[in-house]
Amino acid sequence: MADDHKVESGLNTHVEKRAEEVHQLARQFTEQSTFSTAGQNPFAAEPGSVLDPIGNNFDALAWCKAMLHVHTEDEKAHPLRTLGIAFNNLYVHGFGSDTDYQKSVGNVWFEALALARKALGTQNQRRIQILQNLEGTVEAGEMLVVLGPPGSGCSTFLKTIAGETDGFHIDKESSINYQGVSAKKMAHEFRGEAIYAAEVDVHFPKLTVGDTLYFAARARAPRHIPGGVDVAQYASHKRDVIMAILGISHTKNTIVGNDFIRGVSGGERKRVSIAEACLSSAPLQCWDNSTRGLDSANAIEFCKALRMQADINGATVCVSLYQAPQAAYHYFDKVLVLYEGRQIFFGRTDAAKQYFLDMGFACPERQTDADFLTSMTSHIERVVQPGYEGCVPRTPDEFAARWRGSHQRARVLQDVENYNTKFTLNGEFLGKFRHSRRAQQARVQRVSSPYTLSYAQQVNLCLWRGYQRLKADPSVTISSLIGNVITALVIASIFYNLQPNTSTFFQRGALLFFACLINALGCGLEMLTLYAQRGIVEKHARYALYHPSAEAISSMIMDLPFKVLNAILSLVQALPFCAVVLLGLYSYTGFAIPTGYMLGWARWIAYINPINYGFESLLINEFHDRDFQCVAIVPSGPSYMDLHSRNQVCSTVGSVPGQAFVNGDAYIQSAYDYNVSHKWRNIGIILAFMVVLGAIYLVATDFITEKKSKGEILVFPRGHGALKSGKPDDFEGGSDRNASQEKSKSDRDDLTVIESQTAIFQWQDVCFDIKIGKESRRILDHVDGWVKPGTLTALMGVSGAGKTTLLDVLATRTTLGVISGEMLVDGKPRDESFQRKTGYAQQQDLHLSTATVREALEFSALLRQPAHVPRREKINYVTEVIKLLDMADYADAVIGVPGEGLNVEQRKRLTIGVELAARPALLLFLDEPTSGLDSQTSWAILDLLNKLRKNGQAILCTIHQPSAMLFQRFDRLLFLQAGGQTVYFGDIGQNSQILIDYFVRNGGPPCPPAANPAEWMLDVIGAAPGSHTDIDWFETWRNSPEYAQVQAHLSSLKLEHAQQNPLARVSPGTEREDRASYREFAAPFCAQLREVQIRVFQQFWRSPIYIYSKAILCVLPALFVGFSLFNTPNTIQGLQNQMFSIFLLLIQFGQLIQQIMPHFVTQRALYEVRERPSKTYSWTVFMLSNIGVELFWNSLMSILMFLCWYYPIGMYRNAEPSDTVHLRGAQMWLLIWTFLLFSSTFAHFMIAALDAAENAGNLGSFLLLLCLLFCGVLATPAQLPGFWIFMYRVSPFTYLVSGMLAVGIADTTVTCADNEYLRFDPVNDTTCGQYLAPYIAQAGGYLHDETATAACRFCPVADTNAYLRGVGASYADVWRNFGLMWVFIFTNIVAACLLYWWTRVPRVKKPVVAPQA
């Protein structure tokens, strides 16, 4: 009874406290108000009023109340919806398999066997329990904070509540009640009413913040908008409001960016994600660690905004937080504490701490409530009160058992029962909720649809966004249009003014075939674009903003003007080839393989090929009802003058003896088996194809989603001991947490491995200006400071204050903008070796995903440690770093990608470890090392940094959201405000007293005893959104005695080192003063090349999807062409078919380079963002290694391509008469080998200078078109205009086609097909042999029967060498052609390296030293 009374008393106290806080919040905003808001329309607010989100006086609370008033007064407005939740007996589980090991080219087949076993139901899957027996209620208007370390199940719980259960399963006995709505209806009919905001920020990087948020607001705009404004004004106003609340109004016209495209800062990007989710106006919101990357002030402001939503709109909010500030914790009503998936507390936030105190635990001084509750999950962090050592719980099961037996749990169960009684499933509330939702939807939208806008409105909105994206980044479209214009001019000049005679028959067919071919291949770039935006579209679908198919339609429509323009300007559109199936489309058009030569087993491909019908109609349109003058008569010459017309015939298929012309209909009927009656029928068939395929595509976009992440499961190489240990998989990545925490103290304190440092790094009057548009913006404004050995300096400031920029400038990692100021190491300017002698742990944990932890550390050690250090010593050093960082349990685990592989903490430790493995001789920079980590992990990271500090390491570290206890562990603070201006630089002091005294002395309010100084100082300078200060803290600092002391100390440091050795050149922090210590890179070139080449080969071996897709691209097209032309006969058309088999093989060039380019871009991004700035290895090593590994794999693929293409076609039989089967087979393989090597090096040549694979694809496709046009297949050298002969000679495909065709068909006879014989009568009293003897002697050819006296059957080609001469090829030139291909290959390599150096290697910018006053 006493416990019940205590709990009830605590609840009453909480209610009173919450009411008081709301009143204080209202008073705080009201004091800032200058206008009364009673009855005002927020959409018609006066400029500068408290309701104007653009003005400085904006009052968020006043706006919310005004908006609520307008909404309630409007009779047509939809009723406000609320959505609470009750869950009981909640169990969630997943399945792990035995195949969770690293896949490689060699072992990927085991995965196929496992899939087969799974399909047969014989695979044993391990059931993994994620959540166990959770219960609780969160009523409408309440806020729940979910606490627990990584791996405890926080993310899984939030996903379960939001209905996103992909990858795991909810037990059938579990109960979830959404205020009368079942979980099934919520996931389908009301998706978007309960949303899950993930920790990862996914946006269109080139879209501005304003456009990104306007789109989100517009997509959820209700049918009837209160306030008398249109939908555009409504969406714009809501966007401006949420941006003002979150403090990102200044980023409205800045692109969002991502890890590789510079845009808004990381903290601002996180707030963009928050704003986007808020604009969905979902009544149930689940936020997963959404304060990651935010400073304390903005984290508190975020929670304050959620509190306003809950209090005024009745929103239900569930949030998982790491390192939650105390002020943020107070905004929540309830707290759920999870310990390895078990619930160890659920209840009021003000009762949670007392629950554990009564259990026998103690809360250290200045520890926040949230940190105290989370510390219950770590036996190292939790503190037991004296006398309670033997009775407190220790394991997760013991904590859960204690909770199940508590009075608090009984009250929770009672609350769940009352809730379920009040809100019965599918009861009265469901009808009200559906009515409110329906009132918000467009009139034509389905009642059961989760979307607000109608389908047409969704398409229209996506069209608007597509146009904005096009404006932001038109480079791909413009390059495509320019390429098509140039291509049009080239093609027009080649086929200009075709004469109406039989000599142009092949050219007309080739031209139409080429038009169909290139337009059929126009989907390649679109596929790349669709995959790039897939994650964003799926996120918006989860928010119920629009159908994925609506985005698909809008992308089609957006492309239409450019496709129409392309059709007007040119016959073709050249884009990368992306699918092997396209080979069937352009092989079976009827031109490359005529209908009569299509084998019976493959004839059906032509029937389902829309390009076949298009080509037939185009050819009919070109030849129907036209007579073409004959230009070559057989026989002809001096011996055949004055003959009767029946004794001669036109040497063209479809000719009739005695006619001097050839009818077009007869020609296409004889040559292609085309019927003129099919012309309009084919157009109808094409339209039907368009409708059916378009419908399939739209349905697929709505139902087919990306492969879901398995969670952060540790993956080891196959055969590693960890796979056999039977440890359960961890779906959230926390399984190794306690293992790392259980290391002995002696192991943790072993710091002999870290080298002590002596160098002092100082900077003075550092400014950084960057040009944005036509204006210059100052990012850093006269920043001063120093870092000494054995000190840990914190760099803090509001998000966007320039903290990361300052680190980049100090670490010599900026390539843009203008830097001024002085940066010295022991009084001397930084030399070329500075970057490799410093460690820089970036905020983004970027690592090679296929490497293991140990390999990543060894790679850094081998290439970044001094060259004189023995290799064995470097490897041993890595082992010591692994021990130091407590990474032994996962040292051989694969890094993976974020979401799969190492968890956040492990990645952060690896990032620091990579820098430590380099043995930085000067200092260590760290950018947000605790961002996204829970309080215990953050403490462990700071513990590590303090160990490094004690051993003489100089450390400069930016940090967000430090607790008072974390903040106290730093020695000094460099504090920046917006604009990169210094607010304070100096010692922090015991209990932060020195820092506090400075601000109080200069006009700041006193710091409360229980307050966190790190949060308090942000409030003092007005850094939090909505807070203001009348004190110019930058000027205050510049006029303070502390600033004068800093300047004096900087001068003394410089003078001191100058006096020590004024003449010698000093490279501080090095052990040996030799020339090697001044080198840009620690390792010599050959060592760099060896190590990088080994790593790249390992990476490719461990990328089986990439390698096997490369194999498919080489094998399937070769097999397809080979068996489509299986054992091709040596007829005239057969020889042409064999030539086109080479042409079709060469077309795969585009597809091969398109596969390489995106892969290279990924590798280049990692190199340029992390490895190049740290001077790990040179750009030449990077380029040569990536080119070399592709050459190796393409060499292997050439063998497969050769075998799958050469022998099925039957070209080897052509070498039998000359007994050169083996020689010519080897020659053919060598030519195919050079083709693949050329493809690989050409891809690197194209992408070396360009950022986007799409732009490189456009350029590569254009050059590929030129190669195909001028290779001698579609137009022989004799048919080319004289101006274009040089293109025939510089095209590498010329020598490939010439060489491959000569090797394939030389030195054998030709046997004409029946339709290829020319039929005519000899003159009277002569045989056919006698009649044609003079002509055959002159022109060649042979007769079917020389003794015939009527109906002579003459074949104009007798041997394949004559055919080769006609197309400009000769077997004698084979070795020359092979040598020329190597010239092209080496030219590509040299050009790729030169282009990369010219366009992407940063030029060192020396800072401008400001003149001394």
UniProtKB/Swiss-Prot annotation:
Q: What's a Pfam family this protein contains?
A: ABC2_membrane
**Which keywords belong to this entry?**
ATP-binding, Cell membrane, Glycoprotein, Membrane, Nucleotide-binding, Repeat, Transmembrane, Transmembrane helix, Transport
Q: Where is the ABC transporter domain?
A: 108-365, 761-1003
Q: How is it used?
A: Variecolin and its derivatives produced by employing P450 monooxygenases from other fungal terpenoid pathways exhibit anticancer activity, thus, the skeleton of variecolin could be considered a privileged scaffold for developing anticancer agents.
InterPro entries given in the database record: AAA+_ATPase (IPR003593), ABC2_TM (IPR013525), ABC_trans_N (IPR029481), ABC_transporter-like_ATP-bd (IPR003439), ABCG_dom (IPR043926), ABCG_PDR_1 (IPR034001), ABCG_PDR_2 (IPR034003), P-loop_NTPase (IPR027417)
The job of this chain, per UniProt, is described as: ABC-type transporter; part of the gene cluster that mediates the biosynthesis of the sesterterpene variecolin. VrcC is probably involved in the secretion of variecolin.
Q: What is the official name of this protein in its record?
A: ABC-type transporter vrcC
Per the UniProt record, the source organism is: Aspergillus aculeatus (strain ATCC 16872 / CBS 172.66 / WB 5094)
